[in-house]
């Protein structure tokens, strides 16, 4: 997809940084607002660059416009801000406060030290927890989803994965490419081949060949 100029609802990156700083000052005060703005301006441009492939991929988003009042977009943006602060090696409280802000405003647990893929779509992600795991690109997840390690064992998720509401992937599970985990299904310590739909029921886990392009319901094709 050809890159397009990115416009902001706030108009400028400076105003966007000021908006985030005001929320931090009201909910998680620590530094002065001016200090927060200065620190945020170091990471806002990089976070916006990382929003570009997300905006371009998600069907319901305008590829050329970032709207901080769209809670789905803002959830991703706050994670990216905190993650950029972490990547930069800053060990002050700003990344932690941004993480807390995201939890408070959007009720998601996206820890700043967790590396999510280039394209991820938080679709109504209330109470979702995405923890330590290896994530393939183009991930879609819904509310009450849990991904995380058990002890020292962490999941591996392939590309083009959809985690429907209440899905859980834990331990040393391996989920192949283009798979979907159905609502309320807990995958623990299992290997799932490519192109499968995972169902959970009274008889345990059932794997069925995928007959639908689930990722295509939410993300544009790569060649769009």
Regions found by a protein language model. Give the residues of each.
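Terminal amphipathic alpha-helical/low-complexity segments used for targeting or macromolecular assembly
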Residues: 1-106, 211-224
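Amphipathic repeat-derived elements
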Residues: 43-48, 149-150, 161
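Residue-level signal for alpha-helical context at structural boundaries
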Residues: 58, 62-65, 134, 157, ...
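Left-handed beta-helix
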Residues: 73, 87-138, 144-156, 167-168, ...
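N-terminal alpha-helical segment
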Residues: 77, 121-122, 162
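Glycine-rich hexapeptide-repeat left-handed beta-helix
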Residues: 150-152, 157-224
